[in-house]
């Protein structure tokens, strides 16, 4: 369970106020770290505007003081202005590296001093690390050295660094641009096109060594590292959270209703909740995450109790995100009802199952269902290219025959890991709209290729120097093993596929029938379930047009029961093709439905069985007239004129009319 820390509470954070030693502004102690990280980048050494006549003006005229003097000045000013409050360095202990400035209200326009990277060396107690690695920009993460040096937020870091580079005229590699053109830090595209056959339609990432890429890919899954933090970076769901949608307006206004996010795996449900969480913390809203796979009812009650206390004492809202909410049973879901109704919590649930079947109707009526669709191939390519660029991998045009591995240049500005553009397109297609599968498949393919090259060099006795590593389409396919088939035996897709199979056979489309059968079996469906449905189809849709169809279906069921998968799949395929080609008749099916409709619509008690049709096993029954007047048909050579329906239903033909 993840709960936002107490430093996000505006009531508690106002108890201790400290003054920034650079810009002299007062602020809560919990926000001094993130403020100093930006303030030091925006103000050069000693360039904060002091009051008129201050002795600091003379010091600034003489030039910046050494780092030691600046450190002493911070301690002295903090001690003089806030004797009962710990210094900013001490107050930063125990804080996370989230970089959230909470209720901070100062803006960058209030500073008139030009930015300079020398501000990072002013006060060692609050260091500001710099890194030119493109991975931090693309992935929103800092390298290990930068993470150990400070706790500035990735977004503040990138904006300050971009402003510095723009004003200083320095490119992404730290070299001045002498030609006056903007250099995004990529290696020479023209030279790459000429030497390596690089695709002109792809962005050129900054060159990174293979070992750097390996270190970046180790640890957390790539899908988690690439998770966006803002709606602007959220790709592929414009229909649900596009610019003109109601939900987008509510999220940007921080008016978040109770939501049920419904969509296939990897479409962005958890990511959207992550974006809402980041935005909520900026507005001092408590955000709690639970997973229905391991949470219990007591965990939910504890969260609700805390939410009630937060609302009563601090007027603070609580958003509760339940991942895989369909895993909760009906009684567990009922726990949310009164608290969602009265506004104690705002519930956000994520599910891959149809909420109409898996979520209580009462709870569903109190939430807005947001349908997230499977990501299109174009969106998948965009997501994969963002990850590839952030890793410093270069995309090659596979239509050009030049092999980058054949070049022996060891120039450090050239990329060391390449991937074919065809491999990117194949990965986007095989992921089947699942961004998690695509990104993790890319991670696995790159790591496997780097590892295999290292093992080859070790076995051959060569020095391991992976200056040229190429990821091909086959590497991507091997990483995924097979196409990502979306199928859930207990979910909506189960019923969707069997319905499609039934309708394809009814329409005599043998190709489509085989496709839907294979999709179910390859997705892990029980073959006996399919065989039972075929037995039903034999009588419902074929009926008397081909009476042998029923025998075919029963034989297929018995065969599946005897031999099982995968051998029985051809038995089912034979039966499905036979049914698709067979003539169709619903005469029996329709007539029986007419009989059921007649019985259900009959007014009053049902008519009795005529006496001549009743059995008379005893003398008393015979004396009462049971069986009297019945004509035994085999005793007559001609058809017998005899009524077999109750008197009220005489003349009714269920094969020709729908109702009696």
Curated annotation (Swiss-Prot):
It catalyses: ATP + H2O = ADP + phosphate + H(+). GO terms for molecular function: ATP binding; ATP hydrolysis activity; DNA binding; identical protein binding; zinc ion binding. Pfam families: AAA, AAA_assoc_2, MgsA_C, zf-WRNIP1_ubi. There is a cross-link at residues 81, 141, 220, 296, 305, 311, 317, 330, 477, 622, 628, 631 (Glycyl lysine isopeptide (Lys-Gly) (interchain with G-Cter in ubiquitin)). ATP binds at residues 265-271. Zn(2+) binds at residues 20, 23, 31, 35, 39. The modification N6-acetyllysine is found at residue 628. Residues 76-89 have a biased composition (Polar residues). Ubiquitously expressed. Residues 92-104, 159-182 have a biased composition (Acidic residues). A zinc finger (UBZ4-type) spans 17-44. Residues 135-155 have a biased composition (Low complexity). Residues 48-191 are annotated as: Disordered. GO terms for cellular component: chromosome, telomeric region; nucleus; perinuclear region of cytoplasm. One of its GO terms (biological process) is regulation of DNA-templated DNA replication initiation. PANTHER family: ATPASE WRNIP1, WERNER HELICASE-INTERACTING PROTEIN 1 FAMILY MEMBER. Forms homooligomers, possibly octamers. Directly interacts with POLD1, POLD2 and POLD4. Interacts with the N-terminal domain of WRN. Interacts (via UBZ4-type zinc finger) with monoubiquitin and polyubiquitin. Interacts with TRIM14 and PPP6C; these interactions positively regulate the RIGI signaling pathway. Functions as a modulator of initiation or reinitiation events during DNA polymerase delta-mediated DNA synthesis. In the presence of ATP, stimulation of DNA polymerase delta-mediated DNA synthesis is decreased. Also plays a role in the innate immune defense against viruses. Stabilizes the RIGI dsRNA interaction and promotes RIGI 'Lys-63'-linked polyubiquitination. In turn, RIGI transmits the signal through mitochondrial MAVS. The UBZ4-type zinc finger binds ubiquitin. This is ATPase WRNIP1. The lineage of its organism: Eukaryota, Metazoa, Chordata, Craniata, Vertebrata.
């Amino acid at each position: 369970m993840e709960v936002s820390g107490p430093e996000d509470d505006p009531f508690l954070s106002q108890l201790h106020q400290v003054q920034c030693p650079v810009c002299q502004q007062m602020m809560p102690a919990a926000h001094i770290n993130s403020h100093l990280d930006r303030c030091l980048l925006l103000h050069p050494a000693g360039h904060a505007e002091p009051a008129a006549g201050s002795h600091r003006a003379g010091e600034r005229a003489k030039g910046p003081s050494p780092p030691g003097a600046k450190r002493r000045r911070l301690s002295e000013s903090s001690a003089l202005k806030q004797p009962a409050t710990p210094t900013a360095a001490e107050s930063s202990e125990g804080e996370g590296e989230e970089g959230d400035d909470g209720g901070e209200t100062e803006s960058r326009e209030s500073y008139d001093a030009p930015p300079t990277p020398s501000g990072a060396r002013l006060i060692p107690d609050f260091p500001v690390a710099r890194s030119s690695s493109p991975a931090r920009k693309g992935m929103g993460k800092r390298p290990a050295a930068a993470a150990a040096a400070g706790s500035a937020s990735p977004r503040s870091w990138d904006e300050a660094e971009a402003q510095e580079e723009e004003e200083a005229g320095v490119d992404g590699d730290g070299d001045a641009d002498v030609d006056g053109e903007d250099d995004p830090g990529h290696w020479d595209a023209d030279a790459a096109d000429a030497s390596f056959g690089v695709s002109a339609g792809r962005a050129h990432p900054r060159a990174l060594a293979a070992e750097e890429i390996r270190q970046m890919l180790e640890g957390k899954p790539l899908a988690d590292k690439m998770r966006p933090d803002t709606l602007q970076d959220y790709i592929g769901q414009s229909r649900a959270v596009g610019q003109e949608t109601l939900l987008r307006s509510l999220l940007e206004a921080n008016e978040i209703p109770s939501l049920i996010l419904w969509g296939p795996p990897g479409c962005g449900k958890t990511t959207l909740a992550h974006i809402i969480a980041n935005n909520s913390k900026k507005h001092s809203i408590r955000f709690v995450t639970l997973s229905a796979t391991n949470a219990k009812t007591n965990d939910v009650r504890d969260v609700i109790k805390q939410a009630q206390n937060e609302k009563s004492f601090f007027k603070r809202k609580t958003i509760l995100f339940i991942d895989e909410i369909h895993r909760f049973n009906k009684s567990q879901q009922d726990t949310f009802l009164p608290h969602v109704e009265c506004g104690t919590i705002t519930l956000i649930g994520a599910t891959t199952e149809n909420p109409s079947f898996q979520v209580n109707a009462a709870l569903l009526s109190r939430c807005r269902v947001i349908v997230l669709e499977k990501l299109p191939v174009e969106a998948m390519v965009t997501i994969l290219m963002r990850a590839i660029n952030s890793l410093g991998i270069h995309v090659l045009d596979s239509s050009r025959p030049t092999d980058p591995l054949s070049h022996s240049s060891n120039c450090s500005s050239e990329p060391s890991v390449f991937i074919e553009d065809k491999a990117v397109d194949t990965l986007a297609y095989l992921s089947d709209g699942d961004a998690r599968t695509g990104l993790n498949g890319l991670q696995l393919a790159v790591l496997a290729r780097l590892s295999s090259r290292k093992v080859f060099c070790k076995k051959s006795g060569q020095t391991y120097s992976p200056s040229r590593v190429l990821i091909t389409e086959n590497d991507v396919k091997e990483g995924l093993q097979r196409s990502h088939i979306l199928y859930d035996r207990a979910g909506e897709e189960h019923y969707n596929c069997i319905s499609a199979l039934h309708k394809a056979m009814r329409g005599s489309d043998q190709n489509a029938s085989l496709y839907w059968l294979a999709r179910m079996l390859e997705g892990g469906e029980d073959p006996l379930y399919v065989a039972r449905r075929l037995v039903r189809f034999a009588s419902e849709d074929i009926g008397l047009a081909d009476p042998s169809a029923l025998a075919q279906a029963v034989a297929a069921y018995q065969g599946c029961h005897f031999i099982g998968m995968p051998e029985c799949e051809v038995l089912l395929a034979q039966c499905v093709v036979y049914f698709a080609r067979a003539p169709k008749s619903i005469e029996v099916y329709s007539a029986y439905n007419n009989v059921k409709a007649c019985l259900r619509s009959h007014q009053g008690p049902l008519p009795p069985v005529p006496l001549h049709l009743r059995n008379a096993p005893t003398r008393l029954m015979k004396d009462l007239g049971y069986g009297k007047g019945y004509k035994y048909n085999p005793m007559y050579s001609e058809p017998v004129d005899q009524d077999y329906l109750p008197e009220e239903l005489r003349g009714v033909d269920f094969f020709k009319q729908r109702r009696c």
